[in-house]
Regions:
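Conserved beta-strand positions that form and line the central face of beta-propeller blades
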Residues: 5, 48, 72-75
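Sequence/structural segment immediately N-terminal to covalent heme-attachment motifs in c-type
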Residues: 10-33, 67-68, 88
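Gly/Gly-Pro-rich "capping" loops immediately C-terminal to redox-active cysteine motifs
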Residues: 13-17, 29, 33-63
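Electrostatic cytochrome c docking/interface patches
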Residues: 1-19, 108-111
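Periplasmic/extracellular electron-transfer cofactor-ligation site
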Residues: 21-44, 72-74, 94-103
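Flexible coil segments in periplasmic/lumen-exposed cytochrome c-class electron-transfer proteins
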Residues: 53, 59, 74-111
């Protein structure tokens, strides 16, 4: 998988969280556990990001999935700009799948 061409700052993580909440959390859930609000409505449950087969993937894996779709997930290439897709991938790896997320991002309310 490709590596991000962007060097994101900690401030960028707030934007990544907002993008994730807008585009991803409805299916993947706030913590990436595959328990989003759409699941009780009949949307097939996605695999948890915390499954070792997913958790151990590089950032480029999540960018690739957001760009091209994955399984039943539709591609977002035409809906989310490239930098923002990378930012979502960075947020997933840094904040959902590691302990390296800044406290202000963890507790921030985003819209």
């Amino acid at each position: 998988f490709a590596e991000s061409p962007y060097a994101f700052t900690e401030a960028d993580l707030l934007r990544g969280k907002a993008l994730y909440q807008s585009f991803c959390a409805i299916c993947h859930g706030a913590r990436g556990e595959g328990d989003g609000r759409a699941i009780p409505l009949g949307v097939p449950k996605p695999r948890s990001y915390h499954d070792p087969a997913v958790r151990d993937q590089p950032e480029g894996y999540f960018y690739f999935a957001a760009t091209n779709g994955f399984g039943r997930m539709l591609p977002y290439k035409s809906r989310i700009p490239e930098r923002e897709r990378w930012l979502i991938a960075h947020y997933i790896k840094r904040c959902l799948l590691s302990e390296a997320c800044p406290e202000e991002v963890v507790h921030a309310e985003v819209h």
